[in-house]
């Protein structure tokens, strides 16, 4: 696999994590470096670790991943997105997204939900005899860059949305969950 192919793969894998980063950022009024690092590092680490797990689990784990990955991602993202929408609708006008809290637990769940596909990619990488450490390093770096860019862009527009930012962010998460589910159920992938 060439570097160009690997970067394109990494960009594809990072899209869900970037979209979730946008969703999170829409509910943070003043993004600090701490927020950027928390999100970008968490998503990058999981996008890198999951292919490694898939690579070494390869054949024995492939059927389990393919049968359940879309359900897990769908359920987690719909619950988190639904909670964000509910909190935004029921919040006072002054609160905007103030009920949103970027916790380690939330980021962990989001990182797992958005990196399940990367686990399956790891299975595929094992069949290609690629240098897995090099591959996961590229995937992690690209995910970090994409998430950082997404966070900065979303924060710029999030302040303009006010209370609706939480609703938009929640809808993004629900949309990603539905996309993953539909893609796996009806299009095999």
Swiss-Prot record:
- What keywords appear on the UniProt entry? Cell membrane, Ion transport, Manganese, Membrane, Transmembrane, Transmembrane helix, Transport
Q: Which family does it belong to?
A: Belongs to the MntP (TC 9.B.29) family.
Q: Membrane as a keyword?
A: yes
Select a single GO molecular function from the record's annotations and give it.
Answer: manganese ion transmembrane transporter activity
Q: What does this protein do?
A: Probably functions as a manganese efflux pump.
Q: Which gene does this sequence derive from? A: mntP
Q: How does it sit in the membrane?
A: Multi-pass membrane protein
Gene Ontology terms: cellular component: plasma membrane
Recorded protein name is Putative manganese efflux pump MntP
Q: Where does the protein end up?
A: Cell membrane
- Pfam families named in the record: Mntp
Q: Which residues cross the membrane?
A: 2-22, 36-56, 71-91, 106-126, 132-152, 167-187
Instruction: Decide whether keyword Translocase is in the record.
Output: no
């Amino acid at each position: 696999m060439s570097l160009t192919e690997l970067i394109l793969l990494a960009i594809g894998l990072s899209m869900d994590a970037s979209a979730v980063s946008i969703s999170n950022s829409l509910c943070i009024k003043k993004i600090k470096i701490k927020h950027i690092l928390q999100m970008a590092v968490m998503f990058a680490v999981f996008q890198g670790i999951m292919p490694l797990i898939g690579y070494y689990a390869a054949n024995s784990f492939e059927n389990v991943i393919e049968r359940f990955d879309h359900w897990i991602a769908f359920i987690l993202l719909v619950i988190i997105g639904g909670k964000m929408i509910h909190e935004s609708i029921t919040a006072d006008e002054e609160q905007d997204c103030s009920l949103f809290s970027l916790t380690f637990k939330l980021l962990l769940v989001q990182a797992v939900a958005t990196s399940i596909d990367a686990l399956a990619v790891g299975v595929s990488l094992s069949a290609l005899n690629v240098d897995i450490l090099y591959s996961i390093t590229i995937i992690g770096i690209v995910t970090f860059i994409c998430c950082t860019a997404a966070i900065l862009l979303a924060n710029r527009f999030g302040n303009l949305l006010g209370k609706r930012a939480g609703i938009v962010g929640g809808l993004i998460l629900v949309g990603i969950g539905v996309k993953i589910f539909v893609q796996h159920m009806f299009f095999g992938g």
